[in-house]
From Swiss-Prot:
Residues 20-118 form the Ig-like domain. Residues 79-116 are annotated as: Framework-3. The gene is IGHV4-30-2. The keyword Transcription regulation does not apply. GO terms for cellular component: extracellular region; immunoglobulin complex; plasma membrane. Residues 72-78 are annotated as: Complementarity-determining-2. Immunoglobulins are composed of two identical heavy chains and two identical light chains; disulfide-linked. It is found in: Secreted; Cell membrane. Keywords: Adaptive immunity, Cell membrane, Disulfide bond, Immunity, Immunoglobulin, Immunoglobulin domain, Membrane, Secreted, Signal. The lineage of its organism: Eukaryota, Metazoa, Chordata, Craniata, Vertebrata. Disulfide bonds join 41-116. This is Immunoglobulin heavy variable 4-30-2.
Amino acid sequence: MKHLWFFLLLVAAPRWVLSQLQLQESGSGLVKPSQTLSLTCAVSGGSISSGGYSWSWIRQPPGKGLEWIGYIYHSGSTYYNPSLKSRVTISVDRSKNQFSLKLSSVTAADTAVYYCAR
């Protein structure tokens, strides 16, 4: 019984902590080819400046799996998917506790559901 209880604590504790944090995407839902997609992710229940965390954008094209776009550390350092690197910018606005995605020169291949995550 002790082992089971310990296991439950390990699983439940991170979920309890993460449940305090909420992310909400917003932005243009429809963009014409060659234009720039701009999305924002508002963070509530915690500070975007908290050390040790990265803030990510991912997407899921219709009928396909998740694709990592990139992420930004609390420090401002960014890391992008090499296949999208030339068109992607991720930035943080600490005053508004939010981070943003810009994807330029969009094509039909960029059609997807976009998600922000920590």
